[in-house]
A protein has these predicted regions:
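Phosphate/NTP-binding elements of NTP-utilizing enzymes
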Residues: 1-149
């Protein structure tokens, strides 16, 4: 197994995010601050810790506009998996958009926030994290409220 020095991949501005015990984290930074890169590394790292314990867990990734999911958060998670050398442990799908660990079934689910009611119909258990990409751009606070109800 290849060792990865995460401190070289993370903007020092976001170091505190890695050790916080707070349930909600807001990462602020301008374009090019590597917010999404740091978040994706954190989420993949979190999932892999559970997988190593033999547990099945899930992560929900939400972005305002569904049509940009693949070019943003989906590819960002794939990038993080590549950096962490775990890509070969996962199976990718674009319809429905998921990235699934082949042995445990742990899955990254990707949803557009265009229609908050669609989030209500998705039944996903064992959720360890929800990523709201570009949270400030969400047009409707219902997306946040509805997703928390279903966690």
């Amino acid at each position: 197994m290849q060792t990865v020095q995460l401190s070289k991949e993370i903007n020092p501005h976001f170091y505190d995010m890695w050790t916080t015990d707070k349930p909600y984290i807001v990462c602020k930074g301008g374009r090019g601050s590597f917010k999404s890169s740091v978040i994706s590394l954190k989420l993949v790292t979190m999932m892999m810790k559970y997988i190593q314990q033999g547990k099945t867990v899930n992560v929900i990734c939400i972005r305002e506009n569904q049509q940009y999911l693949r070019d943003s958060v989906y590819n960002q998670i794939l990038w993080a998996m590549n950096i962490l050398h775990v890509s070969n442990e996962f199976q990718t799908r674009v319809s429905p958009m998921t990235i699934r660990h082949t042995l445990t079934g742990s899955t990254f689910y990707f949803y557009g926030a265009n229609d908050p009611q669609k989030l209500k119909s998705n039944i996903v258990g064992n959720i360890i994290a929800v990523w709201f990409e570009e949270f400030a751009n969400l047009k409707n606070v219902d997306v946040f409220d509805l997703s928390l109800i279903h966690i």
